[in-house]
Amino acid sequence: MRLLHTMLRVGNLEKSLDFYQNVLGMKLLRRKDYPEGRFTLAFVGYGDETDSTVLELTHNWDTERYDLGNAYGHIAVEVDDAYEACERVKRQGGNVVREAGPMKHGTTVIAFVEDPDGYKIEFIQKKSGDDSVAYQTA
């Protein structure tokens, strides 16, 4: 077994695709309209679906906003430099909700940003000299 994708419902697919592609650097892997069901699916990610977990962005044509509720936490993305990643988000007009810095009670550098629908995304800075992130999050 392996994790295939996480699905997020989005109110404006074009805004979301712009954010995930141009701000976070993901690639659009595939996109398909379903006119009978009045929805579109778009899959984005850093690698191919055959060997990477990706995001499925679902746009229901008749829904502009969603109530995110209080159960959703965040998606985590490894970055080389969390400080620079936050600056890139700001330059693109994105929302940084927690500036880059060490996590509480630890040394791992993290930051939080929001996508156009308000979903939180955590940046976890890769540790120097380490090929994997420290999976300690706040």
Swiss-Prot record:
**Matching SUPFAM superfamilies, A to Z?**
Glyoxalase/Bleomycin resistance protein/Dihydroxybiphenyl dioxygenase
Q: What does this protein do?
A: Catalyzes the conversion of hemimercaptal, formed from methylglyoxal and glutathione, to S-lactoylglutathione.
Any one GO cellular component localisation term in the record: cytoplasm
Required co-factor?
Ni(2+)
Q: Which gene encodes it?
A: gloA
Binding, Ni(2+): H5, E56, H74, E122
Q: Which residues bind substrate?
A: R9, N60, H74
CDD domains for the chain: GlxI_Ni
Enzyme nomenclature, EC number = 4.4.1.5
Residues at the active site: E122 (proton donor/acceptor)
Q: Which UniProt keywords apply?
A: Lyase, Metal-binding, Nickel
| Reaction it catalyzes | (R)-S-lactoylglutathione = methylglyoxal + glutathione
The protein here is known as: Lactoylglutathione lyase
Write out the similarity annotation. Belongs to the glyoxalase I family.
List each copy of the VOC domain by range. 2-126
Organism source for this protein?
Neisseria meningitidis serogroup B (strain ATCC BAA-335 / MC58)
Q: In which pathway does it act?
A: Secondary metabolite metabolism; methylglyoxal degradation; (R)-lactate from methylglyoxal: step 1/2
Task: List, alphabetically, the PANTHER family matched.
Answer: LACTOYLGLUTATHIONE LYASE
Q: Which GO terms describe its molecular function?
A: lactoylglutathione lyase activity; metal ion binding
How is its cofactor bound, per UniProt? Binds 1 nickel ion per subunit.
Q: Which GO terms describe its biological process?
A: methylglyoxal catabolic process to D-lactate via S-lactoyl-glutathione
